[in-house]
């Protein structure tokens, strides 16, 4: 056991985690030269296209150190985006240490900080690594200084390496073996294994990634899931070297995969503890704290026949992504679907794309909203995650919106632009600290503004140098209103949005103008209105198409023309009473962009 090292690689987006993993795999000979590819651990095609890591991946390698001993390295490559921070915290729970990778050109960024504190909270040993020293812009001394100033861990002898060229990677491995402690655990104790992650395989059923904390797990053992009390047979188990390799036994302290032929998706939830049926452990391991979704949106299949397969797909996906939340919802405009909760907009985009690709579904999304706390006049508190669930205005005593605490790091020269942006987003400054050339800003900004497009705007005002980390702080009373969209005097529930009263006029007008461009012209006038309660704040009309009924009158009597025009008018009026307006898919997506292109 003293020759096992479990560690994660944590860093900000694009600081070179996945490339460093590639080098480590190469040095330890986990894959042959032929099988090696760039970012070999980003196995989803979505990950490869966007060049980001979405799922944490684990690998087991053997490393022959300079002291002649062979060490078993179990490491987990983690995502860098704030939307997938749950993946990171789960991976860290399975480790004794973490490699903190910092780009020597960019220096410390917000996610570096957030992930590092997560690791330190779990009492892990953090080993700083300065990456990308081959870049002309690299300044490793400044980066090391920043790590000490901002993060507060000793970085005087941080390893300097370049994952791309492979310089210094052997030193990283030596440092790992030296600084990160071996796993603590008792091989003789009853089995306790933590489920870090699981996914659904069409042939094998549920495959789980487990970390054996105490005891050993053998092929053919009867395994008991502690939360449900059900028992399964351990059919196959093994390790990843990124390839799946079968083994007969997983020892204490190891990380490996397990197949128990579980067909039920909820059979072995993530964060649960596995033990042996014949000598069970007394208590379960502490799991993971549940994360609360920050953004909610409705997902609806375009054709209602897909509802069943959509439900199954969501089930399988939520097994793989423990932070996804969903419940059935029905809408008059869109039929049956699900209300889903996500950690952020990127998470939402990824989930939607995964559903469409991996399960061949065609989906419509409604506008994302955050959760509001509403105190009704009858003194009860309800949480509202969709505009259609908001009680009528006269029943609301007060409405509170979620406030996010945003930590931003940026070079000094962009400070002015960023502050202007934060004020525009109704932010309140709580803290500002200078570290050398970097400024750390803390703002309290309404969650609704943060999830909409704050990140994109922050990146563009700071030329990509500013970085952001945010978390939910509290609910705060605010003057929010629901803007309804009426088309020919009928409310369309899927188009409603909740916004601040100050922005409501602007938002309403913009939404109505957008809808006007997207709804095709019909044989009659279509009135598009935005309303708060009964008060109409904006209107646009899509003009009717009409035939020139006077074409056949050459000169002639004016009363004849009047008669023909009146006849046409009456016909249009009758048509308007019975006519239905088909809304194109783009109309629902228009909401997503309201307030973006200022």
UniProtKB/Swiss-Prot annotation:
- Record's keyword terms, sorted: Cell inner membrane, Cell membrane, GTP-binding, Hydrolase, Membrane, Nucleotide-binding, Protein biosynthesis
EC assignment: 3.6.5.n1
- Chain ranges of the tr-type G domain: 2-184
Q: What's its catalytic activity?
A: GTP + H2O = GDP + phosphate + H(+)
Superkingdom, according to UniProt?
Bacteria
The entry lists its GO molecular-function terms as: GTP binding; GTPase activity; guanosine tetraphosphate binding; ribosome binding; translation elongation factor activity
Establish whether keyword Secreted is in the entry: no
Q: Cross-referenced PROSITE patterns, in alphabetical order?
A: G_TR_1 (PS00301), G_TR_2 (PS51722)
According to the UniProt record, what class of enzyme is this? hydrolase
Q: What is its main location?
A: membrane
One biological process term in Gene Ontology: positive regulation of translation
Record's subcellular location:
Cell inner membrane
Q: Give the membrane topology, semicolon-separated if more than one.
A: Peripheral membrane protein
* GO CC list: plasma membrane
Q: Which of this chain's residues are annotated to bind GTP?
A: 14-19, 131-134
Which PANTHER family does this chain map to?
TRANSLATION FACTOR GUF1 HOMOLOG, CHLOROPLASTIC, TRANSLATION FACTOR GUF1-RELATED
The family annotation for this protein states: Belongs to the TRAFAC class translation factor GTPase superfamily. Classic translation factor GTPase family. LepA subfamily.
HAMAP family per the UniProt record, alphabetical? LepA (MF_00071)
Q: Describe the task this protein carries out.
A: Required for accurate and efficient protein synthesis under certain stress conditions. May act as a fidelity factor of the translation reaction, by catalyzing a one-codon backward translocation of tRNAs on improperly translocated ribosomes. Back-translocation proceeds from a post-translocation (POST) complex to a pre-translocation (PRE) complex, thus giving elongation factor G a second chance to translocate the tRNAs correctly. Binds to ribosomes in a GTP-dependent manner.
Official protein name in the record: Elongation factor 4
Query: By which gene is this protein encoded?
Result: lepA
